[in-house]
């Protein structure tokens, strides 16, 4: 029996020892014996009989350095650095695994162990070097739940066994971490709202702890163990937190809101102490910082990050002697992070930036526009820049595993965006670790979506494998799972074809790439033909899609006989229909050859069918929408003209509904829900992600929509204008609510034509909507608001809506409407969409849209952010408000009355 003489450094780190264990296991599996020996030298290693296997970090391994210096060990690739490694067979029966770091040694041992397992023996000739292209590579693990826990808000969940039993399951973690090592991940990002109240105890702020003493001890023990297990696999554990979030009991004691928009001395001190204590307790854990959403990052991001967060980090590190500084990652989310990084880079030596890839969906491998500019700028700042594959709201809840699409996305991140690291969300984020399949026991996402993780991390290591070789690789991976090459090839084809559908559908027809849209649940005809009503996010088609046309632009060009530019709605409809059909054929082609894992194969087949039905429900509805929009253009407001176009829309509209019915039926027993975020933040197709979380919940509304449409078309064909169309309702002034203005630097005024709108300057209203005339508005200082932001102290006597006017301009002097794409809490008080578009005209300035935000009785400090705005009234919350536009399209022109019970 052959004996391998294995030389492991006596002072080897846990990473190198783990690599040695992987090697030992592979050698024992092929029947070899292992004898561990001490350090070798160039002069004496030949005196030891048999095969010698030496592993070590070339930076501090004396024998490897000696081999290099005497040119016995030469590299035909780059000499290994960092996580790189080199495998070499050398004279005298010597095999060397040289790593550029301890992690490089681990990966080299892993590589040789894999070769041994595949070949069934030690290769005679070895000369192979490898290193990752991307600096950080890893997945997100969320400590989040699908529903909010009032009075806490979104993201806020203390870490307890009752909320997250899986977090304490060490066997589950070990399985997960071993898989990440298999994929050569070197980071795992744990996402929370405010973790410090569950992981650190502060003598100065005992009220900040949100868990019991027993839970705290369990948390610290679990987290320390987890950090150590990550470290021995070469994985950084990174903890994410939002700013400025504070613990509920801390907020209650100090009478503060849970989410703070600007730094206060007490919140800054609390964070400095929390972070420094955390660093001392868990020295090998990094931090990921979200400076947007609650914090007004444009105003206070630089101050908060540099004067609070980095102060806390450096305070925690000052007495520690670490070989590597923990990574600190700054999210470029709802904040111009360039200024933050410019100030921070001199203050810390291991900084990263991160930004979303395709927003909160997956839409294209050719990102462009503003978002491309943002990535490229961040990647030029001198720190490492990561791309974040985030939420995947358009892929939920189905399986996605199109390796060629994923490979091109990673290449785009590298070459188009300048990224050098990946931050990967699971496919069903909010319900981790479970998948949404209706299966008992519930499936784990790590197993169900194995190809999702495997493909992204394969290409994060090396993006540029040849496509033909990659096809063979993935056929082999599927063949192992389903028992034959024929099955592997066909299942791969099904994944590739079905994987094209959701990205293309969303980028051409969607309202947003943000997580307020659950794409698999469909879209209403109003959302397709009148998207402005639903706050469309233009970055979807201007940054996260190839050049092309939205439905309305396509119809306008078609009617005018103008040439089309880029991909059109009909291009995409025909294209994804073909992809869906090809996927259905491929999965059936696989069926006779599947000899193992039949249950999972059948679940994949159901997903392929579901994606095809979803696709056809979109494409036929889009074809109907083209007819309806053509009617809108040609008829003007002569609604009895060109009714034949509406009639022509009915067959496609009905076919869309038929496919949706089949989809609801198919998923009724196979899926628990469609969307992992079951909160009011989900708005499209219907408000409230909990109430409308399944296709069966949405189907009655789509049935009613089609019924209303056919009824309206019949009335129009008979020469009758539906009720509400013949005459629009008159509007009157809103009912004012009583309030007290406590701010000394603001003034009340009566809203009317010629009213002075700001306390400084002479900005006057030239026209005012009837609803607003006579209301009591509040004047602020325009210059101060545009440069610094202002706060308004107001006391309400009853439930009220505060009417905020946003100027229709993207110039930085004007406050911008909050968006759910950038702030999950943007619609907590309603008012995300305007109630009166162009409700005020202002001499020499842009027109003003009026939004209505709901507030409870009591005293409030209004802090909306940097930029000038108007407050044009405080009204009773109970009254009905009719949405309308004083300029351009009226509520009739939108044609929503065609689908919504005939009401304008």
Give short role names for the model-derived ranges.
Residues 2-5, 11-15, 19-22, 26, ...:
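Feature activates predominantly on carbohydrate-active enzymes
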Residues 728-786, 889-902:
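Glycan-recognition and processing domains
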Residues 28, 42-43, 166, 186, ...:
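Catalytic-core regions of glycoside hydrolase
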Residues 37-74:
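Short, well-ordered secondary-structure micro-motifs within conserved domains or adaptor modules
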Residues 782-784, 790-801, 850-859:
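Extracellular and analogous surface-interaction loops
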Residues 814-882:
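Contiguous ligand/interfacial binding patches
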Residues 426, 430, 438-687, 691-694, ...:
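C-terminal non-catalytic alpha-helical accessory regions
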Residues 798-810:
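A short beta-strand element within beta-rich, extracytoplasmic domains
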């Amino acid at each position: 029996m052959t004996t391998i003489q294995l030389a492991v450094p006596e002072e080897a780190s846990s990473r190198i020892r783990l690599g040695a264990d992987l090697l030992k296991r592979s050698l024992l599996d092929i029947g070899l014996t292992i004898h561990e020996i001490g350090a070798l030298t160039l002069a004496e290693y030949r005196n030891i009989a048999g095969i010698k296997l030496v592993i070590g970090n070339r930076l501090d391994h004396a024998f490897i350095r000696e081999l290099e210096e005497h040119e016995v060990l030469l590299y035909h690739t780059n000499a290994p650095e960092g996580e790189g490694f080199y495998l070499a067979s050398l004279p005298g029966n010597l095999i060397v695994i040289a790593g550029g770091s301890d992690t490089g040694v681990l990966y080299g041992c892993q590589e040789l162990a894999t070769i041994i397992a595949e070949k069934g023996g030690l290769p005679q000739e070895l000369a192979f070097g490898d290193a990752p292209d991307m600096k950080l590579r890893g997945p997100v693990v969320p400590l989040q739940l699908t529903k909010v826990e009032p009075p806490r808000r979104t993201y806020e969940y203390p870490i307890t066994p009752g909320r997250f039993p899986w977090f304490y399951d060490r066997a589950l973690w070990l399985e997960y971490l071993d898989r990440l090592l298999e994929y050569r991940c070197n980071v795992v990002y744990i996402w929370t709202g405010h973790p410090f109240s569950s992981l650190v105890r502060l003598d100065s702020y005992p009220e900040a702890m949100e868990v019991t003493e027993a839970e705290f001890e369990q948390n610290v023990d679990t987290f320390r163990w987890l950090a150590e297990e990550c470290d021995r696999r070469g994985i950084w554990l990174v903890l994410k937190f939002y700013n400025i979030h504070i613990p509920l009991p801390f907020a209650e004691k100090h009478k503060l809101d849970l989410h703070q928009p600007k730094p206060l001395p007490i919140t800054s001190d609390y964070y400095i102490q929390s972070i420094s204590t955390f660093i001392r307790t868990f020295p090998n854990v990094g931090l990921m910082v979200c400076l947007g959403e609650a914090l007004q990052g444009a105003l206070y991001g630089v101050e908060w990050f540099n004067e609070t967060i980095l102060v806390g980090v450096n305070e925690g590190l000052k007495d520690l002697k670490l070989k590597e500084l923990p990574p600190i990652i700054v999210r470029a989310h709802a904040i111009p992070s360039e200024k933050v990084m410019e100030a921070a880079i001199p203050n810390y030596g291991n900084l990263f930036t991160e930004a979303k890839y395709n927003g909160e969906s997956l839409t294209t491998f050719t990102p462009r526009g503003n978002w491309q500019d943002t990535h490229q700028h961040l990647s030029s700042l001198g720190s490492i820049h990561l791309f974040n594959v985030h939420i995947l709201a358009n892929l939920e809840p189905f399986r996605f595993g199109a390796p060629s699409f994923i490979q091109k996305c990673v290449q785009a991140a590298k070459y188009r965006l300048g990224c050098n690291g990946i931050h990967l969300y699971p496919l069903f984020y909010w319900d981790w670790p479970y998948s949404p399949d209706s299966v008992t026991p519930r499936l784990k996402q790590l197993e169900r979506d194995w190809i999702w993780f495997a493909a992204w991390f394969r290409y994060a290591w090396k993006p540029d494998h040849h496509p033909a070789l990659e096809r063979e690789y993935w056929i082999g991976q599927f063949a192992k799972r389903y028992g034959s090459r024929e099955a592997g090839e066909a299942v791969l084809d099904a994944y590739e074809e079905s994987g094209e559908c959701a990205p293309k559908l969303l980028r051409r027809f969607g309202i947003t790439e943000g997580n307020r849209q659950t794409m698999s649940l469909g879209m209403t005809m109003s959302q397709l033909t009148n998207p402005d009503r639903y706050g469309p996010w233009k970055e979807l088609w201007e940054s996260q899609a190839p050049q092309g046309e939205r439905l309305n632009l396509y119809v306008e060009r078609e009617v005018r006989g103008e040439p089309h530019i880029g991909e059109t709605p009909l291009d995409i409809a025909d294209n994804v229909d073909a992809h869906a059909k090809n996927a259905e054929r491929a999965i059936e082609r696989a069926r006779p050859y599947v000899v193992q894992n039949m249950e999972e194969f059948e679940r994949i087949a159901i997903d392929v069918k579901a994606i095809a039905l979803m696709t056809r429900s979109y494409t036929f509805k889009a074809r109907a929408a083209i007819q309806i929009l053509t009617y809108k253009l040609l008829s003007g407001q002569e609604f009895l003209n060109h009714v034949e176009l509406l009639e022509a829309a009915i067959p496609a509209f009905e076919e869309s509904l038929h496919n949706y019915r089949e989809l609801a039926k198919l998923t009724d027993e196979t899926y628990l829900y469609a969307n992992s975020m079951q909160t009011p933040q989900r708005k499209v197709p219907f408000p409230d992600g909990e109430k409308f979380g399944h296709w069966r919940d949405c189907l009655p509304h789509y049935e009613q929509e089609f019924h209303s449409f056919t009824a309206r078309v019949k009335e129009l064909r008979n020469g009758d204008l539906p009720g509400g169309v013949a005459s629009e309702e008159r509007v009157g002034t809103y009912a004012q609510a009583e309030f007290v203005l406590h701010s000394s630097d603001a003034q009340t005024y009566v809203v009317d034509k010629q009213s002075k709108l700001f306390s400084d300057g002479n900005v006057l209203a030239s026209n005012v909507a009837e609803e607003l005339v006579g209301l009591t508005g509040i004047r602020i200082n325009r210059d101060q608001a545009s440069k610094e932001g202002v706060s308004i102290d107001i006391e309400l006597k009853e439930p009220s809506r505060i009417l905020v006017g946003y100027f229709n301009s993207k110039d930085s002097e004007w406050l911008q409407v909050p968006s759910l794409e950038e702030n999950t809490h943007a619609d907590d008080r309603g008012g995300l969409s305007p109630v009166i578009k162009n409700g005020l005209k202002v001499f020499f300035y842009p027109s003003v849209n009026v939004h209505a935000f709901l507030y409870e009785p009591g005293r409030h400090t209004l802090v909306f952010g940097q930029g000038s705005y108007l407050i044009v009234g405080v009204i009773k919350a109970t009254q009905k408000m009719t949405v309308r536009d004083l300029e351009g399209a009226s509520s009739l022109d939108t044609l929503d009355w065609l689908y919504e019970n005939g009401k304008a």
